[in-house]
UniProtKB/Swiss-Prot annotation:
SUPFAM superfamilies: Neurotransmitter-gated ion-channel transmembrane pore (SSF90112), Nicotinic receptor ligand binding domain-like (SSF63712). Disulfide bonds join C155-C169. Keywords: Cell membrane, Disulfide bond, Glycoprotein, Ion channel, Ion transport, Ligand-gated ion channel, Membrane, Postsynaptic cell membrane, Receptor, Signal, Synapse, Transmembrane, Transmembrane helix, Transport. This is Neuronal acetylcholine receptor subunit non-alpha-2. It comes from the Eukaryota. GO terms for molecular function: acetylcholine-gated monoatomic cation-selective channel activity; transmembrane signaling receptor activity. The chain crosses the membrane at residues 235-259, 267-284, 301-322, 429-446. Neuronal AChR seems to be composed of two different type of subunits: alpha and beta. Residues 362-384 are annotated as: Disordered. It is found in: Postsynaptic cell membrane; Cell membrane. Glycans are attached at N53, N168. Residues 323-428 are cytoplasmic.
Amino acid sequence: MTLAVIGLFTLFTSIIAITPAREFVSLAEREDALLRELFQGYQRWVRPVQHANHSVKVRFGLKISQLVDVDEKNQLMTTNVWLWQEWLDYKLRWNPENYGGITSIRVPSESIWLPDIVLYENADGRFEGSLMTKAIVRYNGMITWTPPASYKSACTMDVTFFPFDRQNCSMKFGSWTYDGNMVKLVLINQQVDRSDFFDNGEWEILSATGVKGSRQDSHLSYPYITYSFILKRLPLFYTLFLIIPCLGLSFLTVLVFYLPSDEGEKVSLSTSVLVSLTVFLLVIEEIIPSSSKVIPLIGEYLLFIMIFVTLSIIVTIFVINVHHRSSATYHPMSPWVRSLFLQRLPHLLCMRGNTDRYHYPELEPHSPDLKPRNKKGPPGPEGEGQALINLLEQATNSVRYISRHIKKEHFIREVVQDWKFVAQVLDRIFLWTFLTVSVLGTILIFTPALKMFLRTPPPPSP
């Protein structure tokens, strides 16, 4: 009894193990027979049409998976896409009932007729650009081929508002040899499929639409499909590492006039800022394309600051010259200078005035100079009185000389202090002037770019 049960169990498991393999072999044999039947006498160089005046209708669509790079310097856009191509090949039809219910097969794309659709604006010499993957052939003759492709397409860059710019890059697809009478392109979907798109860290795709067009050549019409990609740069990186440092450098230029006028580091600070701006300008030159048509926004701003800093150096040298003026350097102060810079402007600039601190002293008194008498008087009380008078006259002359000398030194010191105060007033004037120009220049330069950056793109035309 035990042996009988073991035998039945072994027979049952053998049947289960053998049956799927037989069915698999049968399915493979049927698919092999189908392929032999379909491709017997099949010529992949011949268009799949029954009449010469018929055209092959190719449904075309684009799916983007990644925006790899946008090279502004070389004006290239690198993308990874899938090309959706679908057409009818009447020579590849069969009845599924005759082949075990097989409704579709996968065949190498090299063995069937393909529409030679290429990217016209290809920039790396590989116009086909796609991988020769297998195509899906259905029993009704409908062929679907979706090869992945990596393209480097030419794109004219407009860097006017860099780094707040938007670019319009296009990809034009069409048949290389077939005109519109042989191959008719049909746009599957106006919008590019972005369901599996991998975000780019620098660019954002605002819109990606396709439109059908045609070009005329020797009385023949060649259809094509153009996909336009509206790209917006994400400016955070350039704002943090380019624009904000430039704003800081311009602010340092303004602070030069807040330093004391006798500081020799004022010119050194302005010169260091000018060198830093030159380095930033060289960095931008490595990024943007070398074009004389437009000047990028950040380039305009850097040139503005460089002119700004150069003027500040010139003004600083003038202020230092004023600071070191005195009567000893043969720079007497004019009355209008004294009235303007020592009386009027300090009140307008909220500075403590330096007015009426001194008057021009009379270095030579109008009183007659008393000269000592050398006459010797007669001896006695009168002679002693005359000697005392002479001694007093000599002492008076000495005191008068010392007084004149002190007044002169005081006058020179006051003149020096007045010129220093004039230099302070000039510093305060240029501080507010340069601060106003810096703020207004920054606003005027960046406002159009910010308006364009924040503007919502128009909806695509149907």
